[in-house]
Amino acid sequence: MKIDILTLFPEMFAPLEHSIVGKAKEKGLLDIHYHNFRDYAEKARHVDDEPYGGGQGMLLRAQPIFDTIEQIEAKKPRIILLDPAGKPFTQAYAEELALEEELIFICGHYEGYDERIKTLVTDEISLGDFVLTGGELAAMTMVDATVRLIPQVLGKESSHQDDSFSSGLLEYPQYTRPYDYRGMTVPDVLMSGHHERIRLWRLEESLRKTYLRRPDLLERYDFSEEERKLLDKIKEALGQGED
């Protein structure tokens, strides 16, 4: 995969040289480039200007963005504008991006963008319902979430499949050695070696955690009959069963 990032602060992306993204680069699975679009700005390298019609703040000018993208060698890239008004970033969207060969991220600053910049992009994406100083942190988050899904990046191909959100549910609790730590013990079912009981326990715990912490995820979840029965059991135990 090839990723190009348009930013005023390329140095902010140093963390991507480490951990999973760094390993993907070492394996030759990822080629990532940073472009300071101030280098392509006309008018004394100014990248922002006042909005027509008045208003507070400054807008990112179209010219530096257009010129930067036009010099990037890409066949048919997915061009992503990081914008608080965009669609929410999700695990499903990261899985979609992981199938692409070329991605371009545009990191904004200031009050917003000249609307004409949006004629370049294929996607307008938001990290969440909050505003950041710039798009760099959002871009790093999206790159990390996407790159780890590229085949052969993680040690085991199934590693990411059990992650929270990959199945549509939050991940079940997990434990490692020792069995007893300060009086807190590992659930006996995990010590039983009984694979079916362990599977059911994990599924029930995933449903429980999702129901208690992120019930919104269940509104669009496609339940199996087994999962529906387990959820009813959970609700009944919590005294929230249907009348």
Curated annotation (Swiss-Prot):
Q: What is its EC number?
A: 2.1.1.228
Any one cellular-component term (Gene Ontology): cytosol
Q: Which Pfam families match?
A: tRNA_m1G_MT
Q: Which UniProt keywords apply?
A: Cytoplasm, Methyltransferase, S-adenosyl-L-methionine, Transferase, tRNA processing
Q: Where in the cell is it found?
A: Cytoplasm
Q: Name one GO molecular function term.
A: tRNA (guanine(37)-N1)-methyltransferase activity
Q: What are the binding positions for S-adenosyl-L-methionine in this chain?
A: 108, 127-132
Q: Read off the Gene3D superfamilies from this record.
A: 3.40.1280.10, tRNA(m1g37)methyltransferase, domain 2 (1.10.1270.20)
Which terms does the UniProt entry file under GO BP? tRNA N1-guanine methylation
Spell out the reaction equation it catalyses. guanosine(37) in tRNA + S-adenosyl-L-methionine = N(1)-methylguanosine(37) in tRNA + S-adenosyl-L-homocysteine + H(+)
For this protein, the record's NCBIfam families field holds:
PRK00026.1 (NF000648), trmD (TIGR00088)
Purpose of the protein: Specifically methylates guanosine-37 in various tRNAs.
UniProt xrefs under HAMAP family? TrmD
- According to its UniProt record, which protein family does this protein belong to? Belongs to the RNA methyltransferase TrmD family.
Q: How does it assemble?
A: Homodimer.
**Protein name (record):** tRNA (guanine-N(1)-)-methyltransferase
Give the organism the record lists. Streptococcus pyogenes serotype M3 (strain ATCC BAA-595 / MGAS315)
